[in-house]
Amino acid sequence: IATVDCSDYPKPVCSLEYMPLCGSDSKTYSNKCNFCNAVVDSNGTLTLSHFGKC
């Protein structure tokens, strides 16, 4: 199981770096910051499916 440490988030502004992650909602997030903010918004229901595009 792939995991991402989101303890540093949410951050108000995410960088533009592109390191895609695929969430359990089948959406591709452009980087860890955007993914972690979505995890926080989902109250922890969103998980990482795998690294890379969905």
Curated annotation (Swiss-Prot):
Coarse class of the protein's main subcellular location: secreted
Pfam families: Kazal_1 (PF00050)
Annotated site location: Reactive bond 3: L16, E17
Record's subcellular location: Secreted
The entry's keywords: Disulfide bond, Glycoprotein, Protease inhibitor, Repeat, Secreted, Serine protease inhibitor
InterPro entries listed in its UniProt record: Bifunctional_prot_inhibitor (IPR051597), Kazal_dom (IPR002350), Kazal_dom_sf (IPR036058), Prot_inh_Kazal-m (IPR001239)
Assigned GO CC terms: extracellular region
Residues carrying a glycan: N43
A GO molecular-function descriptor: serine-type endopeptidase inhibitor activity
Cysteines engaged in disulfide bonds, as pairs: C6-C36, C14-C33, C22-C54
UniProt key word Cytoplasm: no
Kazal-like domain residues: 4-54
CDD domains found in the cross-reference section: KAZAL_FS
Keyword NAD: no
Domains: entry comment: Avian ovomucoid consists of three homologous, tandem Kazal family inhibitory domains.
PANTHER family, per database record: OVOMUCOID-LIKE-RELATED, SERINE PEPTIDASE INHIBITOR, KAZAL TYPE 2, TANDEM DUPLICATE 1-RELATED
Protein name: Ovomucoid
Annotated organism of origin: Leucocarbo albiventer
